[in-house]
Structures are given as C-alpha cells and as structure tokens.
C-alpha cells in the first residue's frame, strides 16, 4: 500500500541519519539520497514523528555526544565526532537541550559513576 511505502522510507531515513550523524546532513543531501523532494521528506517526517527532521538530527547528535562524554572522551574530540559544524554550535545546542554545558554534564556522569 502507498502508506506503508512511506513508513518504509522513513525507517530508511532514520537509519541513514544515524549512520551519517558526523557528516553534513542537509535536506538536499537527503533529497538526493532518497529521490524525494525535501519538502516531502520534511512533511512526512513531521507528520509521522511530530518533530522536524532538523530537531531529530540535533537530538540524535546530542545523544551520540552524551554517550561519548560518558566514555570520558575529551570534549574537543566529542565535538569533532558530533557532526555539529562548530564548537560554538555544539556547545549552544547541548546547553539548550540539557540545561548544562558539556563539561558540567561530564562532571555529573563522574559523580553518578562514583555513587553507583
């Protein structure tokens, strides 16, 4: 059916984003990858997930950063592996999402590790 084909496509989009998080993930790139207009991808994504594709990418990158920070990887390295274009962008997005800086987050992970 037509509906399930779009769902399948979205699963592919999720997988593609997850496996290319560290790269530049523009809508144009997704458009070329999936042979669908970026308007269509954006609309379908929002309709099925309730969030924008940009928001999903940012959140996926931040989740990835958190797991790297939890492994005690230096923040300068985390940022390079994050897919955010600049340290500033990474820093601001992180703080906005979690209400703390990446280094503050690192300190909380160390505390939790000691207390468990």
Give the predicted meaning of each segment.
Residues 107-116:
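Generic C-terminal helix-cap and adjacent flexible tail
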Residues 2-13, 49, 53, 58-61, ...:
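N-terminal positioning helix adjacent to the helix-turn-helix/winged-helix DNA-binding module
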């Amino acid at each position: 059916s037509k509906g399930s084909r779009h769902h399948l496509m979205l699963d592919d989009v999720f997988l593609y984003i997850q496996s290319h998080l560290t790269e530049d993930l523009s809508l144009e790139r997704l458009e070329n990858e999936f042979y669908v207009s970026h308007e269509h991808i954006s609309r379908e994504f929002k309709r099925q997930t309730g969030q924008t594709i940009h928001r999903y990418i940012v959140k996926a990158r931040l989740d990835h950063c958190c797991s790297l920070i939890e492994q005690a990887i230096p923040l300068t390295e985390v940022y390079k592996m994050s897919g955010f274009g600049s340290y500033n962008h990474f820093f601001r997005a992180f703080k906005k999402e979690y209400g703390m800086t990446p280094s503050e987050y690192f300190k909380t992970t160390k505390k939790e590790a000691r207390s468990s």
